[in-house]
């Protein structure tokens, strides 16, 4: 497999994402509470410490976090008198992203996988799920419980309504991703299917199922979604984005 470490997310192909998942070392991630004579057990000497797992604690109680393949060796030690294992992920291929690297507002409960790009001042609300290969533009809000599928491209200053589904494409590898251009508003519980392009400044009504491209500056609604009118002053006033919601300070 070709080296993709220096590639931007936008440059990753379906084939590369498939190989990334297939070839990744699957990990079972756990949180383990341990008690015992930890003073006699130098956990930092165990293989994988600092890279595969971490430890926080004192002389008689602590918490291990990381790859269970390495942590289970510690649990076999006689110095450990009791422990409790909490499973976070099982045979996981792609980890969650380190959200501290994003200059965005990310609320508790959002699930963001690695290999995702999030623009400055974007807002990711509670329960939103963003899959690998997705791109979220500057100032865009992903509302509560929205699903952004693999390789979806969402432009700048969009609002993706609560409960919406932006379809992802990894397989078949020939499938084209969803592209949502700048300044688009998508209503709650709308569904945008694979390969659809939603043109700039357009509006997708709540509950719509979009199966074909949406021209710029149009409003679509229904199942399947159809153009019902051009964006007008009334539409603009009803779908206006609030800049203050995107400020980080």
Curated annotation (Swiss-Prot):
Gene Ontology molecular function: tetrahydrodipicolinate N-acetyltransferase activity
The UniProt record lists the keyword Phosphoprotein: no
Cysteines paired by S-S bonds: none
SUPFAM superfamilies assigned to the protein according to its UniProt record, in alphabetical order: Trimeric LpxA-like enzymes
Keyword annotations of the record: Acyltransferase, Amino-acid biosynthesis, Diaminopimelate biosynthesis, Lysine biosynthesis, Repeat, Transferase
Pathways involved: Amino-acid biosynthesis; L-lysine biosynthesis via DAP pathway; LL-2,6-diaminopimelate from (S)-tetrahydrodipicolinate (acetylase route): step 1/3
EC number: 2.3.1.89
Keyword check for Transferase: yes
Family, similarity comment: Belongs to the transferase hexapeptide repeat family. DapH subfamily.
Name used for this protein in its record: 2,3,4,5-tetrahydropyridine-2,6-dicarboxylate N-acetyltransferase
Species this protein is from: Fervidobacterium nodosum (strain ATCC 35602 / DSM 5306 / Rt17-B1)
Record lineage: Bacteria, Thermotogati, Thermotogota, Thermotogae, Thermotogales
């Amino acid at each position: 497999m070709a080296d993709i470490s220096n590639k931007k997310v936008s440059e990753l192909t379906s084939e590369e994402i498939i190989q990334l998942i297939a070839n990744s070392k699957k990990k079972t991630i756990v949180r383990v509470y341990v008690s015992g004579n930890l003073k006699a057990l130098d956990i930092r000497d165990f293989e994988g410490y600092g890279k595969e797992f971490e430890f926080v604690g004192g002389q008689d109680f602590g918490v291990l976090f990381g790859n269970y393949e390495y942590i289970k060796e510690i649990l076999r030690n006689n110095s450990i008198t009791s422990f409790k294992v909490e499973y976070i992920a099982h045979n996981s291929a792609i980890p969650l992203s380190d959200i501290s690297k994003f200059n965005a507002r990310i609320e508790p409960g959002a699930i963001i996988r690695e290999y995702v790009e999030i623009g400055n001042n974007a807002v990711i609300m509670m329960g939103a799920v963003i899959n690998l290969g997705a791109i979220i533009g500057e100032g865009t809000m992903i509302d509560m419980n929205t699903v952004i599928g693999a390789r979806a491209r969402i432009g700048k200053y969009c609002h993706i309504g609560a409960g919406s589904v932006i379809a992802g494409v990894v397989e078949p590898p020939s499938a084209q991703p969803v592209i949502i251009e700048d300044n688009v508003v998508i209503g709650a519980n709308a569904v945008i299917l694979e390969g659809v392009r939603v043109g700039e400044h357009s509006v997708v009504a709540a509950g719509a199922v979009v199966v074909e491209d949406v021209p710029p500056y149009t409003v679509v609604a229904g199942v399947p979604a159809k153009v019902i009118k051009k964006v007008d002053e009334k539409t603009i006033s009803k779908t206006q984005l609030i800049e203050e919601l995107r400020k980080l300070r």
